[in-house]
């Protein structure tokens, strides 16, 4: 069974269409909502552009490192609303009489999630701890009642897409730090031009290989990654130059091995776990990590970002 649930890429100017179960934006439903769920979920995709947020509301943590301005400013999110199509109340009341109000609220909530992801990426690059009070004051503001779900969804998104985990180190005062998932010591942030951590992509590639056995054909890797908009030959994805990242950078870092399949003619290539990956993690840990985030046996990927700016990129 394919590792991902297929989704169609669409350009930001064309809007977004439903893309299946967007992992990282599904598992953070409020407990009461989960208990009351009696029917299948329906999804609404909302595009959130941080450039639309007034400057006074944009998160700007102190002591941001050089190059922080090159961080992505546009994030596409999926807002999941539970539908209770079989309920008698809905049949009696009919369609919502406040569709515009509901849509406006969803957009506002998505904008806050986008702001928080941006804020957390800046904190990670600066290697700075942060507190709940700082998030509430700098980002969440008037949405404090919705902080738990906003924080949970933003944290899940960071884990899956970027391979970054939020860890609470001091319960009193709620002090947090950001670390790479699974104890991996690589994040790809080696220079000022590096915009986002690459650990998430590494974990997904390692999971694809683990799922296939000891090795995975190159075409299988690109097939699975196509849903991440990191397909072979696509150099404008969130993971800039994905082919170079997989076949050179991660090979040089000893996380992956990239070799020709013995006896193949024409030449075919395959990926294997490198020695560094075998030392730092395991097949079981990688697969369990993705299953834990997805909350079920089927792994799917969220729609990734369409970056508004590429400052510092070649």
UniProtKB/Swiss-Prot annotation:
One of its GO terms (molecular function) is histone deacetylase binding. Transmembrane segments: none annotated. It comes from the Eukaryota. The lineage of its organism: Eukaryota, Metazoa, Chordata, Craniata, Vertebrata. Keywords: Tumor antigen. Expressed in many tumors of several types, such as melanoma, head and neck squamous cell carcinoma, lung carcinoma and breast carcinoma, but not in normal tissues except for testes. Residues 17-44 have a biased composition (Low complexity). This is Melanoma-associated antigen 12. Pfam families: MAGE (PF01454), MAGE_N (PF12440). The keyword RNA-binding does not apply. Not known, though may play a role tumor transformation or progression. In vitro promotes cell viability in melanoma cell lines. GO terms for biological process: negative regulation of transcription by RNA polymerase II. Residues 109-308 form the MAGE domain. Residues 1-14 have a biased composition (Basic and acidic residues).
